[in-house]
């Protein structure tokens, strides 16, 4: 049985908003509302949803880059929530991150070798020669030359810069890599190359991915399991192939309808999603998706649905999950 690399339990993150008056009530953006999931060793887990759904906030909290209001994040059984910088330092080698922007995430004043080696500061027992050897090894693994270590980021294309970022994430030989929209800033022609590289590296090193994306086609290609987020909550979770073939939440269904897939052979009327996600700033009764949902009924406005089992390792938070695939019929 595969061991659990990442376990997130009831994670909560609320951002306070500026008060409208001195004695006014404190308002919040409810970015994460009790998010829970696990990722097994050697697998890829996708987090999908529109901008503003909480994906990147989740990534920052998993990486302990900001304070968490409540909940637990365990990496290889080690709790990271509430840890000080000094306490996190020896744990950092086990989890690394690849950021969205290959231009902004690399210091232009540092050589590639220095950038890639930076995470090794968490590994105390490496000498200079071993660090240099590790840099050469990992640059070769991502399709770059060891001699590229002497160059600067501006000498590389966007796709090459993202390879440098991936090399930096791999340098400590982590168990987990959190990839936040790692190909969205790249040309379409380069995206496939980077995705193939990520798959090859997983086969070679056995690394586990938490992969964040708004592009469901990318998640389908790379991820074994996935969770769909809406306004800070997971509304559906399961094996990627199961969710694609049998979505159990109307939000998931609508997101999937937006993905061209001529090879699927399935014919169904496409449902369009009206409006956009602006962030949840107040608690409200009922389902958070009710204003945009084509299936909304009185029960949805009165009672918030909870995650329930809809199949093997497949859960969804919808009162009418068994009717989702009937959307647009007739």
Regions found by a protein language model. Give the residues of each.
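Conserved ABC transporter NBD signature motif
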Residues: 71-82
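Conserved ABC ATPase signature
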Residues: 152-156, 160
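P-loop NTP-binding/switch modules centered on Walker-like glycine-rich loops
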Residues: 178, 182, 186, 190-268
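Conserved ABC ATPase "signature" region
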Residues: 79, 129-147, 256-257
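A short, proline-enriched helix->beta-strand linker immediately N-terminal to the Walker B motif
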Residues: 171-175
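Short catalytic/signature loops enriched in Gly
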Residues: 3-4, 17-23, 239-330
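ABC ATPase NBD coupling module
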Residues: 22-26, 80-96, 122, 129, ...
């Amino acid at each position: 049985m595969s061991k659990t690399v990442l376990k997130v339990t009831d994670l909560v993150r609320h951002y306070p908003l500026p008060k409208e008056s001195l004695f006014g009530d404190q308002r919040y953006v409810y970015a994460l509302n009790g998010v829970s999931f696990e990722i097994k060793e050697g697998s890829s887990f996708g987090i999908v949803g529109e901008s503003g759904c909480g994906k990147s906030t989740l990534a920052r909290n998993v990486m302990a880059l900001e304070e968490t209001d409540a909940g637990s994040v365990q990496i290889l059984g080690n709790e990271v929530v509430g840890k000080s910088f000094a306490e996190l330092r020896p744990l950092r080698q086990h989890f690394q991150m690849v950021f969205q922007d290959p231009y902004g995430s690399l210091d232009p004043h540092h050589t590639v070798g220095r950038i890639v080696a930076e995470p090794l500061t968490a590994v105390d027992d490496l000498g200079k020669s071993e660090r240099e050897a590790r840099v050469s090894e990992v640059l070769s693994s991502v399709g770059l030359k060891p001699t590229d270590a002497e160059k600067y980021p501006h000498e590389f294309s966007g796709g090459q810069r993202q390879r440098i970022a991936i090399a930096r994430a791999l340098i400590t030989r982590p168990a987990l890599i959190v990839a936040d929209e790692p190909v969205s800033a790249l040309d379409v022609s380069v995206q496939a190359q980077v995705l193939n590289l990520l798959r090859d590296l997983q086969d070679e090193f056995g690394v586990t991915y938490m992969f964040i994306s708004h592009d469901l086609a990318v998640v389908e290609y790379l991820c074994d399991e996935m969770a769909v987020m809406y306004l800070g909550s997971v509304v559906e979770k399961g094996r990627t192939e199961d969710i694609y073939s049998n979505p159990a939440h109307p939000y998931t269904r609508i997101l999937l309808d937006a993905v061209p897939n001529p090879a699927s052979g399935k014919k169904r009327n496409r449902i369009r999603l009206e409006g956009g996600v602006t962030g949840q700033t107040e608690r409200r009764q009922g389902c958070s998706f009710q204003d945009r949902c084509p299936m909304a009924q009185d029960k949805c406005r009165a009672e918030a649905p909870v995650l329930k089992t809809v199949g093997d390792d497949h859960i969804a938070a919808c009162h009418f999950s068994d009717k989702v695939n009937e959307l647009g019929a007739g």
